[in-house]
């Protein structure tokens, strides 16, 4: 009798784990909020060449690496 109860429990647990059994709110995956990609750190170079105006502003506000025309930035 104990063996039958144990097998039934394991079978129902396997169905829930596979998502074929009870579909309650706790068996669904948690959706992650969409996060906008940020400018990667390798874009914020010290030479300020080849980056856009938006990237230059982002580097200046986040990292303190501010590009100026005198340093070679031509945005």
From Swiss-Prot:
Keywords: Amidation, Antibiotic, Antimicrobial, Chitin-binding, Disulfide bond, Fungicide, Pyrrolidone carboxylic acid, Signal
Subcellular location, principal: cytoplasm
Disulfide bridge map: 44-59, 48-66, 60-67
InterPro entries noted in UniProt: Penaeidin
Top-level taxonomic group: Eukaryota
Pyrrolidone carboxylic acid modified-residue sites: 20
Location in the cell: Cytoplasmic granule
GO cellular component, one term: cytoplasm
Residues with the Serine amide modification: 74
Keyword hit for Lyase: no
Signal peptide range in chain numbering: 1-19
GO MF assignments: chitin binding
Gene Ontology biological process terms from the UniProt entry: defense response to bacterium; defense response to fungus; killing of cells of another organism
Free-text function comment from the UniProt entry: Antibacterial and antifungal activity. Presents chitin-binding activity.
Family recorded in the similarity comment: Belongs to the penaeidin family.
Protein name: Penaeidin-3l
The species this protein was found in: Penaeus setiferus (Atlantic white shrimp)
């Amino acid at each position: 009798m104990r063996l039958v109860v144990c097998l039934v429990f394991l079978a129902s647990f396997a169905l829930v784990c596979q998502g074929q059994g009870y579909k309650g709110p706790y068996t669904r995956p948690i959706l992650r909020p969409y996060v906008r990609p940020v400018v990667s750190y390798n874009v914020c170079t010290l030479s300020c060449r080849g980056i856009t105006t938006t990237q230059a502003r982002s580097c200046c506000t986040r990292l303190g690496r501010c590009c100026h025309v005198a340093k070679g930035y031509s945005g």
